[in-house]
């Protein structure tokens, strides 16, 4: 019941976000039909009657509320419209690009978690040590510099100079055999996934360190140390478990960041995913595709909230019991 309630609370938020995105996209300058004519002048007619029919077909002259509900009805039935840039149904484009982005973002998220968690814990336990100072410097540098800068540096060092990884793309054409294809995909994945994941490590390390330090200063942790409980057990069983709630908040709610960050990383590495698709849709004023991509990001954000709630309850069941008693 708790998760059902949380899910139902997100439904009106979803519709509110859809209204905001739809209004913003429809407030942008430009005429979709004019854009379609510029992209494919041979396929578009100059006949005024035909243009009028097309405007009626796409509901371009309808009042904004009518346009919104017409669009919403189509979306809820699985019709996301037609891409004027790719000359293909939007839902087919998303279906073909989404798996590529999921592979990239999930790998990057796991890389970020694998690096940030131990570094943050060690930095908190060894407070004011050389390791802690070095970690702090690294974190501030990582937070200050943009992701595309790291991407370009990584390409120059590991692709151009060392030749360890491909410069761009997701696969090398002409390769046959399962293991050859698999290893080739991994080589293409390593660089963009590490760049996307390690950029986020900087901020995660700071949150993990701060959260764990607050718990390590609590009386019950000092009591455990005074009773002779081994350091590893105190940190993992007592301190880290109670420090996990704010850490979960950041790590779970940063999932949309990876999809947003993929927009830049996929563009730099020419990775054929949702980020690059969204970038191309925006710069080419492909309204149907741009709106659908933005709605996809909104859905990912809402799902991240549900994931965070689920992890909260796993770490501390009292959260669910507290909500029931409220």
Placement of each model-derived feature along the sequence:
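Alpha-helical transmembrane segments of integral membrane proteins
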Residues: 1, 98-131, 147, 172, ...
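Hydrophobic secretory-pathway targeting helix
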Residues: 1-21
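Residue-level signal for discrete positions within transmembrane alpha-helices
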Residues: 10, 97, 101, 137-140, ...
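Hydrophobic alpha-helical transmembrane segments of membrane transport/permease proteins
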Residues: 14-66, 162-182
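Membrane-water interface segments at the C-terminal ends of transmembrane alpha-helices
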Residues: 20-27, 73, 138-168, 195-197, ...
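Juxtamembrane/transmembrane-helix interface segments of polytopic membrane transporters
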Residues: 21-25, 30, 151, 155-159, ...
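Short hydrophobic, aromatic-rich alpha-helical segments embedded in or entering the lipid bilayer
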Residues: 45-77, 269-281
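An internal, D/E-rich "acidic patch" concept
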Residues: 59-117
């Amino acid at each position: 019941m708790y998760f059902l309630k949380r899910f139902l609370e997100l439904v009106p938020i979803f519709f509110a976000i859809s209204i905001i995105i739809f209004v913003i996209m429809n407030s942008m300058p430009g005429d979709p039909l004019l854009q379609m004519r510029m992209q494919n002048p041979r396929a578009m007619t100059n006949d005024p009657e035909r243009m009028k029919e097309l405007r009626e077909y796409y509901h371009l002259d309808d009042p904004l509320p009518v346009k919104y509900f017409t669009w919403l009805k189509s979306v809820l039935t699985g019709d996301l419209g037609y891409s004027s840039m790719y000359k293909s149904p939007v839902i087919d484009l998303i279906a073909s690009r989404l798996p590529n982005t999921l592979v990239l973002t999930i790998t990057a998220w796991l890389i970020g978690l694998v690096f940030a968690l131990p570094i943050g814990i060690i930095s908190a336990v060894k407070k004011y040590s050389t390791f802690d100072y070095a970690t702090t410097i690294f974190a501030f540098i990582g937070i200050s510099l943009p992701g595309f800068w790291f991407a370009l540096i990584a390409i120059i060092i590991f692709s151009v100079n060392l030749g360890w990884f491909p410069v761009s793309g997701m696969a090398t054409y002409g390769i046959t055999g399962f293991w050859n294809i698999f290893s080739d995909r991994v080589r293409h994945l390593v660089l963009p996934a590490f760049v996307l994941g390690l950029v986020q490590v900087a901020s995660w390390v700071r949150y993990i360190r701060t959260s764990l330090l607050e718990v390590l200063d609590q009386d019950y942790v000092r009591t455990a140390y005074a009773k002779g409980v081994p350091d590893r057990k105190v940190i993992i069983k007592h301190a880290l478990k109670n420090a996990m709630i704010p850490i979960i908040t950041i790590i779970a709610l940063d999932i949309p960041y990876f999809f947003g960050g993929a927009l830049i990383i996929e563009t730099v590495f020419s990775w054929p995913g949702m980020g690059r698709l969204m970038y191309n849709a925006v710069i080419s004023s492909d309204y149907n595709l741009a709106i659908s991509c933005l709605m996809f990001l909104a859905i990912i954000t809402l799902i991240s909230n549900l994931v965070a709630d689920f992890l909260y309850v796993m770490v501390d069941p009292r959260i669910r019991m507290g909500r029931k008693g409220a």
